[in-house]
Amino acid sequence: MKEELIERFTRYVKIDTQSNEDSHTVPTTPGQIEFGKLLVEELKEVGLTEVTMDDNGYVMATLPANTDKDVPVIGFLAHLDTATDFTGKNVKPQIHENFDGNAITLNEELNIVLTPEQFPELPSYKGHTIITTDGTTLLGADDKAGLTEIMVAMNYLIHNPQIKHGKIRVAFTPDEEIGRGPAHFDVEAFGASFAYTMDGGPLGGLEYESFNAAGAKLTFNGTNTHPGTAKNKMRNATKLAMEFNGHLPVEEAPEYTEGYEGFYHLLSLNGDVEQSKAYYIIRDFDRKNFEARKNTIENIVKQMQEKYGQNAVVLEMNDQYYNMLEKIEPVREIVDIAYEAMKSLNIEPNIHPIRGGTDGSQLSYMGLPTPNIFTGGENYHGKFEYVSVDVMEKAVQVIIEIARRFEEQA
């Protein structure tokens, strides 16, 4: 199993599947189409049936039931795309067997080192096989680790028919990282009662609370003139963006928050004197606080429009997803089964809110309750990202055990 995990994962991460916030196609990048087509062929090779890829790049497949019991149809999902925060082109995965727990030089030439001082969890992976980047790209374990685990689990179940299970549906979705993952997901065609996203982090992660999330695009329009004669004429759009950001509470940013605390996050800022564009994400677990944060954004914009003119600041703000807890609680047994599956494998479940989003956040509101399960990755979205193959193996075992328990309890 370990060899298959390594082979699939290292091959998958070399395919550039970063999504693109500025694209209006579905999926937003051609790499996701390329990857989806590859997975269609590999799902067929593994032995799954009803393998499809629609015009929007959504891949679905079925592992038929091998029991006569009336078992609820369950699904396992992962996403095709990788994050936009750091380059995902020309990923060169580095395999470190029997990791010694000490610092790893990712790139000697650029002096990029993964250290326990910066990442204190690193020594806990001593003895594991871990896969890192070469320091110049992200790894893409988010979510190609989860995708790999689903592929390996389905392959294992097909080759071990003594493990009884109901019908299992698999789906791989595009554009999760930019909040569009389930936008064109056909819940009815998927046909599952419940599902799990394999899109978590370290060992034991079991998540069914997520942020409420919104995105805000702000365009600041200035007036450019020669700086030598600019008095009372120039309006600097970049300074307008700085002024806007200055109105937000400094301590309510990702770098100062944890647990159930929400935040405003300036994701990007580009521009010049004439025009600047800023993109923020707004996050909070509590719906009232979430709405209050959006109101804060709107009020700052209104104040600046009153001061500088209506066209000085233009706001586009959209909700992206909501806290899935509301939709998971009525079917709490799906969390309990995952919890029991982990305990039976001597994995201590770590239940905590997702300080992020998964496809499950939106799918739960579309009628498909979908908690999230660990994959073994750490430090997502950057050059220090890595994954433990040993933990990936545990994740595969959890998928198998969940399928077995649904059949057993039917």
Curated annotation (Swiss-Prot):
It comes from the Bacteria. Zn(2+) 1 binds at residues 79, 142, 199. The active site is at 81, 176 (proton acceptor). Keywords: Aminopeptidase, Cytoplasm, Hydrolase, Metal-binding, Metalloprotease, Protease, Zinc. This is Peptidase T. PROSITE patterns: ARGE_DAPE_CPG2_1, ARGE_DAPE_CPG2_2. It is found in: Cytoplasm. Its cofactor is Zn(2+). Its main location: cytoplasm. The keyword Zinc applies.
